[in-house]
């Protein structure tokens, strides 16, 4: 899904300020309605676990506003990734530009898998744990392993090599 273009830097900067004390990461500099107060947290959380802020009848993702205000660079055609996968953590140190593919590398594994580790599943026919990884939308076989942890370690090594800082590493 392509993100909505943001209003101008001047417009956003006149109303919002980045704040480490606000749960959303933004405070009101100049409220746009009577419910809002100067220096109070700006934004509301939605079911999908992202912070949003209302501005000129438009719902904006707070992490995109923060990145734009801090870096003052056009982000209309890029994805902003939460490094720690916590979409509520809008600290500027937790936000980075990424491609859609890089963002997919930084996600946890599927919840309905036969393994609790990303990139690992059980092969019924071989009775071994299989490690695999996606590269350029193609599944790449890493190997078969006697135990789940060894397969997870093999996945981690491949993920670090292939995805670098965007790799999601299993906790083993």
Predicted regions and their residues:
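Short, cationic Gly/His-enriched loop motifs
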Residues: 31, 56-139, 160, 171
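A short, exposed loop/beta-hairpin motif centered on an aromatic-Gly-Thr core
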Residues: 138-148
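Short coil/turn linker and secondary-structure boundary residues
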Residues: 4-7, 98, 146
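Short helix-coil boundary/hinge micro-motifs
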Residues: 1-51, 55
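A short, charged, amphipathic alpha-helix used as a generic interaction element across diverse proteins
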Residues: 146-162
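Short, solvent-exposed beta-strand edge segments and adjacent coil->beta transition regions
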Residues: 48-50, 137-140
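Beta-sandwich strand segments
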Residues: 166-169
